[in-house]
Swiss-Prot record:
Optimum pH is between 8.5-9.5. No catalytic activity is detected below pH 7.5. This is 3 beta-hydroxysteroid dehydrogenase/Delta 5-->4-isomerase. Gene3D superfamilies: NAD(P)-binding Rossmann-like Domain. Coiled coil: none annotated. The lineage of its organism: Bacteria, Bacillati, Actinomycetota, Actinomycetes, Mycobacteriales. It comes from Mycobacterium tuberculosis (strain ATCC 25618 / H37Rv). Signal peptide: none annotated. Keywords: Cytoplasm, Isomerase, Lipid degradation, Lipid metabolism, Multifunctional enzyme, NAD, Oxidoreductase, Steroid metabolism.
Amino acid sequence: MLRRMGDASLTTELGRVLVTGGAGFVGANLVTTLLDRGHWVRSFDRAPSLLPAHPQLEVLQGDITDADVCAAAVDGIDTIFHTAAIIELMGGASVTDEYRQRSFAVNVGGTENLLHAGQRAGVQRFVYTSSNSVVMGGQNIAGGDETLPYTDRFNDLYTETKVVAERFVLAQNGVDGMLTCAIRPSGIWGNGDQTMFRKLFESVLKGHVKVLVGRKSARLDNSYVHNLIHGFILAAAHLVPDGTAPGQAYFINDAEPINMFEFARPVLEACGQRWPKMRISGPAVRWVMTGWQRLHFRFGFPAPLLEPLAVERLYLDNYFSIAKARRDLGYEPLFTTQQALTECLPYYVSLFEQMKNEARAEKTAATVKP
């Protein structure tokens, strides 16, 4: 079916804003940016907020799986940015019911609670944080766009729950006057990152990064946090009747596809780490990690060094076009990868040193006899 084109010139003010996951990496950066732009913001998270007090900021601590708490969170709100999620990168038939239910309760049930509460409260706009992995099914994707179908091959619960939740959010567009859209980031990085490079640093400090996985020509894209936030705000502003964004999904990234190891190399070298020289087969590593994951869930083995999805990102092309976001939202990355790296390299070096000192202290404590 042909999509009826909206008018990209139609935009709106955001009004009073709710940010879920406001204590997290993306959410906290989004809250800060919105406050800097003069918006009134309510930050909602189950974790305590570390944001400094601000006259335009209200902090609500609570659980998104509680419908009553969601009702309180959306009261008086005009625009919702939903960034809260559990990131579980293992999945498949071998996972336990408890592991699966935890992800679905937050990522799907929590999204449903929040959106329905917003509809009842008269919220006008809902921007959902999805993932580019919703279309990744183990194939090479070079410059893919939003016409790609959802994957039905799930290596991880994060992707599985994001597919279900994104479909739900977009299907609710226009219901009770609320307009919805979904943003599909790639790997999110920048000051405050506690996921992408932290996981890499953990592997380095444990001595696990001895080889490079996959071909050097395989590329992925990333989403610098302030480029992503720029995309969020543009999308919300375009959630207007007859506008371009209602009911749509958008890839938002830095538009600079790069091999993951080449992307990480300047960071690790700045941390004083030697760069591996040897390369090994990506599919072989994925096969080993998939089997290891089954042993983890069925027999209690330690978790695999890499999740199957993480391995695929190392040896398959998985990067996406931002042409639709450019056309519909006027999106262009605010920062190049080099500009962003210059800005946040001191943060990453500091994080690595902190983690190294913590690991050394733990090792020392473990060797001290009681």
